[in-house]
Regions:
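Short loop/turn segments that flank or connect secondary-structure elements
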Residues: 1-172
Length: 172
């Protein structure tokens, strides 16, 4: 779930703010030394559409999927519970869908995985009652993909990762 941030504090957030036509460099592939390292020990929030795609991909009922792969956390200040992907019970706390060759649910991976290394939020102007999406380029320090030469804009990255449908299903 998103944390409220005051508009004057937006520049204090970690990462580089990326606007619609700004470019960033990123490419992840098995030859980067850190391949799959980001798929560990995550607080990975699942949206209803993520759950739907994953359970169908795995051939599970909703109940079976939630029981096997999800932690539901009710935080005191929140009206709705947080739905988190449960990490594997191994020393690295890997994503349960991580296999040697990468992600075993890649075509149906969650929205958060699709948009990585971009993090998104909403800028809410209480006076105008408007919401504006904001994006930050935030790869972890160990990420070598950020030093690759492949250049992207936000719309090109969303298209490449087939993230537009996920955005439509999760932003509302």
């Amino acid at each position: 779930s998103m944390k409220p941030i005051e508009i004057e504090d937006i520049d204090k957030l970690p990462g580089i703010r990326i606007k619609e036509n700004d470019t960033f460099c990123f490419r992840c592939h098995p030859e980067v030394e850190c391949f799959n390292r980001c798929c560990r020990n995550l607080n990975l929030f699942l949206y209803p559409y993520d759950v739907l795609r994953l359970k169908q991909s795995l051939g599970l009922s909703s109940d079976a999927f939630l029981d096997r792969y999800v932690d539901i956390v009710l935080r005191p200040a929140n009206f709705f519970p947080d739905v988190l992907l449960r990490m594997a019970e191994n020393p690295q706390k890997t994503c349960p869908f991580l296999i040697e060759s990468g992600c075993k649910v890649y075509p149906d991976r969650p929205d958060t995985c699709r948009t990585f290394p971009i993090e998104q939020g909403m800028l809410y102007d209480a006076g105008r009652k408007t919401e504006t999406p904001v994006h930050f380029f935030r790869p972890p320090d160990f990420c070598q993909g950020q030093y690759e030469k492949k250049e992207w804009t936000l719309p090109a990255w969303a298209r490449d990762q087939e993230a537009e449908l996920y955005h439509q299903m999760t932003v509302r």
